[in-house]
Amino acid sequence: MIFEHEIPSGSKLYFGESAKVKRDIEYVSSEILDNLGFEEIVTPLFSYHQHESFDDKKPLVRLNDEENNEVTLRADSTADVVRIVTKRLGRSTESKKWFYNQPTVTFPTTEQYQIGAEIIDGSFEEIARTTITLLNEIDTQPVMQIANIRIPHLLNEKYGVSLEVLKSMHVEQIMAADLPWIDQLARLHSVDDLNDLSAFPDDIKEELKKIKEATKKVEYANMVISPLFYAKMRYYDSLTFRMFENNTLLATGGIYTIDGVEAAGFALYTDECISSKMSKEEDK
């Protein structure tokens, strides 16, 4: 039996202080992004093309329009923003920097509020620094973990290391690879660990250099590297970052390609930021 006051699992309810914190985070972030030259965009909740961004269609909430064409509720803002800006708005706008403040919805009843931004032809360091600026403004300095998705793909394609093993971080299985440098690769953690890359083959070394250059340009004190990090990401294909406070993921971002368009972007997870801010207020 479902009572009248019940809300579906995974959906969000904010009221009183939590609603105020949500409003403050969204307002401050929007003002900062506007001052940094980003244009705001609100994309439709309904989409004809979300399924093109998902290999696994299970997260999509699907329904049909009046002509029985399949539509889905917005499960990913990034792909829609890039496609709308480049293919629908086209020459009607010269801006390459866009931000949004809107939720995503995934099956069965999960809502996630996000503040995100995309820069067409953007750089990793600009999008990373922008994310840091927003998080600083809401009084949090999480750990930034930088990775390069190309490294796991090279390990899989050229050196026989399974992506599933990397995804699950089975260290023993990774170490079992007959590669004299794999142990050293797994031990890379701090920015200083990138000072000597002589042990690695040229292709791996080249991708590690990209991480090294990114750390120099971003200039953030609370930073670690994770060259073996792998997750099945829909369009990220090179440098990525994740920002954690304790074990809570507050933001992700990086550089990516969608429909041949190269861009950089991030998503700040508003719900987690609200919890973080309220927890700190309670501790005072």
Task: Enumerate the language-model features and the residues they cover.
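TRNA-binding/sensing appendages of the translation machinery
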Residues: 1-70
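A conserved hydrophobic position in a structured secondary element of the catalytic/binding core
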Residues: 73, 146-147, 268
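Short, surface-exposed amphipathic charged segments that create phosphate/polyanion-binding patches used
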Residues: 158-163, 239-242
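Beta-rich nucleic-acid/ligand-interaction surfaces
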Residues: 42-60, 147-157, 222-224, 228-238
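Extended cationic-aromatic binding surfaces that line active-site or macromolecule-binding grooves
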Residues: 67-82
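Positively charged, Gly/Ser-enriched RNA/tRNA-binding surfaces
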Residues: 18-39, 47-48, 78-80, 85-89, ...
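Acidic, His- and aromatic-enriched active-site or binding-groove loops in soluble protein domains
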Residues: 61-65, 160-177
